[in-house]
């Protein structure tokens, strides 16, 4: 699917929702609108600031303008320079700061108050705490007994599409992108004439937990929005895993269709919502997902 097709899907879905389509988006770079690149090292520099991200560590460059343009065009670690065979102090400190940020978002919990504020039913997997979640991924693939009963009692049965939100490995991905992806996604699915299930939040969930959810609720399509494993300096990336007629015993990873890198610096959440709506419609038409779908 090329950019033109994606933009057409966005316009179509937004028009059906009675909203103006957003302007065609471009991949955003965190350094695009930052201050002029800095070449000197400073202990007082905030390592998470735009100034630190724009820092150029190459001393006495032959073409400083080329390095400046390169630095502004990407969030990758370029133009950091060297001190002999080793990285410069500023580059190393920023690397460590970004690594710490990534670890923090993995270990953080989605606040219960936040879940209640969104009006979401909260259930959990067989995991009871974050440490167990990181060490026993198999337990994160199954709902606890209380969760199974809650879904049967409080969720719409036999929906065309069931939307599930889970913290996964990034709390920030859920809390930052939620407002921009779930409302347009739910509205788009309903505008398409589909029976949409009750959206809910799964704490400590892994991707395969959507198979059990689909089986319990009798959903034709299950869409799981889950926090991605964070990269260095990027802790807000969300993924969508969609699967048709999932079954715990027979569904394999190749049966899933994944849309990753959903965040303001990648695929914008509103745009992703429109693409997911179109994907769900095609899954229902073809009665397939993953590698079984025709392009």
Swiss-Prot record:
GO cellular component, one term: ethanolamine degradation polyhedral organelle
Cofactor binding description: Binds 1 AdoCbl between the large and small subunits, with 6 cofactors per holoenzyme.
Activation and inhibition: Inhibited by 5-adeninylpentylcobalamin (AdePeCbl), a cofactor analog. Irreversibly inhibited during catalysis by cleavage of the Co-C bond of the cobalamin coenzyme. Reactivated by EutA, which probably involves an ATP-dependent cobalamin exchange.
Binding positions (adenosylcob(III)alamin): 207, 228, 258
Enzyme Commission number: 4.3.1.7
GO terms classed as biological process: amino acid metabolic process; ethanolamine catabolic process
Main location per the UniProt record: other
Catalytic reaction list: ethanolamine = acetaldehyde + NH4(+)
InterPro entries the record matches: EutC, EutC_C
Subcellular location as annotated: Bacterial microcompartment
Pathway listed: Amine and polyamine degradation; ethanolamine degradation
UniProt-recorded Gene Ontology molecular function terms: cobalamin binding; ethanolamine ammonia-lyase activity
Induction field: When grown in ethanolamine and adenosylcobalamin (AdoCbl) (at protein level). Note this experiment was done in strain JM109, which expresses the eut operon.
Keywords from the named record: Bacterial microcompartment, Cobalamin, Cobalt, Lyase
Cofactor(s) essential for the protein: adenosylcob(III)alamin
Domain notes for this protein: Partial trypsin digestion of this subunit (removing the first 28 residues) yields an active protein less susceptible to aggregation.
Subunit and partners: The basic unit is a heterodimer, which further associates into a trimer of heterotetramers. 6 large subunits form a core ring with 6 small subunits projecting outwards.
HAMAP family: EutC
Family per similarity comment: Belongs to the EutC family.
Function: Catalyzes the deamination of various vicinal amino-alcohols to oxo compounds. Ethanolamine ammonia-lyase (EAL) allows bacteria to utilize ethanolamine as the sole source of nitrogen and carbon in the presence of external vitamin B12. It is spontaneously inactivated by its substrate and reactivated by EutA. Directly targeted to the BMC. May play a role in bacterial microcompartment (BMC) assembly or maintenance.
Name recorded for this polypeptide: Ethanolamine ammonia-lyase small subunit
Organism: Escherichia coli (strain K12)
């Amino acid at each position: 699917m090329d950019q033109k097709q994606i933009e057409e899907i966005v316009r179509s879905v937004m028009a059906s929702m009675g909203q103006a389509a957003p302007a065609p988006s471009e991949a955003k770079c965190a350094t695009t609108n930052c201050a002029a690149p800095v070449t000197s090292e400073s202990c007082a520099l905030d390592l998470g600031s735009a100034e630190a991200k724009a820092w150029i560590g190459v001393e006495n460059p032959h073409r400083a303008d080329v390095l400046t343009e390169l630095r502004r065009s990407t969030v990758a670690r370029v133009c950091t320079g060297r001190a002999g065979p080793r990285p410069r102090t500023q580059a190393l400190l920023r690397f460590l700061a970004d690594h710490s940020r990534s670890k923090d978002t993995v270990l953080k919990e989605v606040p219960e108050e936040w879940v209640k504020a969104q009006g979401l039913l909260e259930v959990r997997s067989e995991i009871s705490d974050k440490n167990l979640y990181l060490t026993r991924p198999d337990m994160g693939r199954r709902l606890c007994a209380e969760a199974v009963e809650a879904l049967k009692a409080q969720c719409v049965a036999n929906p065309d599409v069931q939307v599930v939100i889970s913290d996964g490995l990034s709390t920030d991905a859920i809390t930052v992108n939620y407002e921009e992806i779930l409302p347009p996604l739910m509205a788009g699915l309903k505008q398409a004439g589909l029976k949409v299930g009750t959206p809910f939040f799964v704490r400590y969930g892994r991707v395969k937990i959507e198979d059990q959810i689909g089986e319990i609720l009798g959903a034709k399509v299950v869409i799981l929005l889950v926090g991605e494993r964070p990269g260095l300096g990027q802790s807000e990336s969300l993924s969508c895993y969609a699967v048709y007629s999932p079954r715990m015993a027979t569904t394999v990873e190749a049966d899933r269709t994944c849309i990753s890198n959903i965040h303001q610096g990648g695929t914008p959440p509103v745009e992703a919502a429109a693409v997911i709506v179109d994907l769900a419609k095609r899954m229902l038409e073809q009665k397939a997902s993953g590698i079984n779908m025709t392009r």
